[in-house]
Amino acid sequence: MKPTFIIFASLLSVGLATEAIAAGKTGAEVAQTCVMCHGENGLATMPGTPSLAGQPEIYLSSQLKQFRDGKRHNEVMNVIAQPLSDAEIDAVSAWFAQFEVHVKKR
């Protein structure tokens, strides 16, 4: 590879990484709190806890913002969502929405 290309690519990736850091946590990072109840990859194993995997991103984002803003009430979710920024909510919503859910026939 040409040295100029390597330098350009390095500078570009540093710029993108800095932008991502400035925007807050990634969806996967925010999700580390969620997986305790909602399961790895959003497939819940606890009774009464909804699975998040494959849910529409806009739905997940809307619900988290309602929990954060006190418009939807759940003691646990209101506390968990409170410190999240819009960018973090959008990132974690996109992260859970990306997983496909496969249902087995009985």
Name these PLM-found stretches:
Residues 33, 59, 76-79, 91:
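Extracytoplasmic/secreted proteins, especially bacterial periplasmic and envelope-associated proteins
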Residues 9-10, 20-21:
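Cleavable N-terminal signal peptides
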Residues 82-106:
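C-terminal capping alpha-helices of c-type cytochrome domains
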Residues 42-69, 78-82:
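Gly/Gly-Pro-rich "capping" loops immediately C-terminal to redox-active cysteine motifs
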Residues 1-7:
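Bacterial N-terminal signal peptides that target proteins for export
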Residues 71-73:
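Extended intrinsically disordered, low-complexity coil regions enriched in Ser, Thr, Gly, Ala
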Residues 21-43, 53-55, 104:
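Sequence/structural segment immediately N-terminal to covalent heme-attachment motifs in c-type
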Residues 15-19:
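N-terminal signal peptide c-region/cleavage motif recognized by signal peptidases
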